[in-house]
């Protein structure tokens, strides 16, 4: 029985590369001259620190442009609220969404059932396995899942016949 896996992954190396080029650009930009703005990644979070919200917004714009250039989907980025940090600075945390949550997997299974596809979905940890009777049915399911917005980037792996 043919099957494939639906996953949501982010290439952390590309995120690091985008982060480093953004930091390099911030150090050379005129509007950040003399600023103590900083940006760092800790596991699945990117922490931005700057003097005011305007600079935080500029940093997010620069980072998102670099991420898009590197092929990282911006749906994987969840922007947190601005909070006060030490020394009169502002802090903002960007979370990277990695893996399918159970709720999103259930929505995908419901989407496949409502679409009358001859494919069944089963949740396996942070991924979804979809199996069906024919390859054509699975390819139609992939096309439908790609066309629908679930709020996070989805990739299709492990296609088996």
Swiss-Prot record:
Return the CDD domains for the record.
YajQ_like (cd11740)
- Entries under PANTHER family matching the protein: UPF0234 PROTEIN YAJQ
Keyword annotations of the record: Nucleotide-binding
Leader sequence range is none
Please name one Pfam family that this protein belongs to.
DUF520
Q: What is this protein called?
A: Nucleotide-binding protein AFE_0977
What positions belong to coiled-coil segments?
none
| Function noted in UniProt | Nucleotide-binding protein.
Concerning its family, UniProt says: Belongs to the YajQ family.
A GO molecular function held by the record: nucleotide binding
Q: What GO cellular component entries does it have?
A: cytosol
Annotated Gene3D superfamilies: 3.30.70.860, YajQ-like, domain 2
Domain of life where this protein originates: Bacteria
Record keyword Nucleotide-binding present: yes
């Amino acid at each position: 029985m043919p099957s494939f896996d639906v996953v949501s992954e982010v290439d952390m190396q590309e995120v690091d590369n985008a982060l480093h080029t953004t930091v390099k650009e911030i150090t050379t930009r005129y509007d950040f001259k003399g600023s103590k703005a900083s940006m760092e990644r800790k596991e699945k979070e990117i922490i931005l620190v700057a003097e005011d919200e305007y600079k935080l917004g500029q940093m997010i714009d620069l980072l998102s442009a670099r991420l898009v250039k590197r092929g990282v989907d911006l749906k994987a980025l969840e922007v947190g609220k601005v909070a006060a940090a030490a020394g009169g600075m502002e802090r903002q945390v960007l979370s990277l969404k990695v893996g399918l949550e159970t709720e999103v997997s259930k929505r995908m299974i419901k989407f496949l059932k409502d679409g009358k596809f001859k494919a069944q979905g089963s949740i396996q940890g942070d991924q979804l396995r979809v199996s069906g009777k024919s390859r054509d049915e699975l390819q139609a399911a992939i096309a439908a899942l790609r066309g629908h917005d679930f709020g996070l980037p989805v990739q299709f792996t492990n296609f088996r016949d």
